[in-house]
């Protein structure tokens, strides 16, 4: 068991030991020569170099590994690298550009959402029905009220006629009484007032639509003192 473990360690050192030593050198990047041929990059030292050839030397058009530090090639100043030829003039973008793009998109979404919300609130909201203004017309009110007044006053016509007939009969009776009183000598009785007729017009301020029936207006009688020694008959019993 121990012999098998020692054999594995030996094989690993033989496989990775020299390669690990070679990985300590510089890396020569790929380049394009004068004829336009591209050469792949390699790690110093290469398989055919000595172990101390860990520095990338030469020129931009021809690169190799060497051990002299003064012959070291500054690969950063070369412009014939393949990536420089494929993408000439490309510079690194600033770090804040992606954040600026994301922020602009976010602000655009906010503005668009606000516009859509305002449109939905103003245009898609159901409109309330407008109320018609109530217009009051005096003429229409009088037209509607006049039939009601006429119908309410029509049943009173017989009573007015009866009152007129009653007043006429009472007037006639009073005239007869006063005529009888005049026949007695020595009694002075004032003449009765003239009966009210329809020929006498009474001007009353009344609104249109109302009917005023003619009424009997009784005139008061002034009593005169009786003469001494004379008696007047009493007609109250009649």
Swiss-Prot record:
GO terms for cellular component: endoplasmic reticulum membrane. One of its GO terms (biological process) is negative regulation of canonical Wnt signaling pathway. The chain crosses the membrane at residues 99-119. Keywords: Developmental protein, Endoplasmic reticulum, Membrane, Signal, Transmembrane, Transmembrane helix. InterPro entries: Shisa, Shisa_N. Residues 120-238 are cytoplasmic. Residues 22-98 are lumenal. Residues 159-173 have a biased composition (Low complexity). Residues 1-21 form the signal peptide. It comes from the Eukaryota. It is found in: Endoplasmic reticulum membrane. Residues 151-173 are annotated as: Disordered. It is a single-pass type I membrane protein. Plays an essential role in the maturation of presomitic mesoderm cells by individual attenuation of both FGF and WNT signaling. PANTHER family: PROTEIN SHISA-3 HOMOLOG, SHISA. Belongs to the shisa family. This is Protein shisa-3 homolog. It comes from Homo sapiens (Human). The lineage of its organism: Eukaryota, Metazoa, Chordata, Craniata, Vertebrata. The gene is SHISA3.
């Amino acid at each position: 068991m121990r012999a098998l473990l020692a054999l594995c360690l030996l094989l690993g050192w033989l496989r990775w030991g020299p390669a690990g030593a070679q990985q300590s050198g510089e890396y020569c990047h790929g380049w394009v020569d004068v004829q336009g041929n591209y050469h792949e990059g390699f790690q110093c030292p290469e398989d055919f170099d000595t172990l101390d050839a860990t520095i990338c030397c030469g020129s931009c058009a021809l690169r190799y590994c060497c051990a002299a530090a003064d012959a070291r090639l500054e690969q950063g100043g070369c412009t014939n690298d393949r990536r420089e030829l494929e993408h000439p003039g490309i510079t690194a973008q600033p770090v804040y550009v992606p954040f600026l793009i994301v922020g602009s998109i976010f602000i655009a979404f906010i503005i668009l959402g606000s516009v859509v919300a305002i449109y939905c609130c103003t245009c898609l909201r159901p409109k309330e029905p407008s109320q018609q203004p109530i217009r009051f017309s005096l003429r229409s009110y009088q037209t509607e009220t006049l039939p009601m007044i006429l119908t309410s006053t029509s049943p009173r016509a017989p009573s007015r006629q009866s009152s007129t007939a009653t007043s006429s009969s009472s007037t006639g009776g009073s005239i007869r009484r006063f005529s009888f009183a005049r026949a007695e000598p020595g009694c002075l009785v004032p003449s009765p007032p003239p009966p009210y007729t329809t020929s006498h017009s009474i001007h009353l301020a009344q609104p249109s639509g109302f009917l005023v029936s003619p009424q009997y207006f009784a005139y008061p009688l002034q009593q005169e003192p009786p003469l001494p020694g004379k008696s007047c008959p009493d007609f109250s019993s009649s």
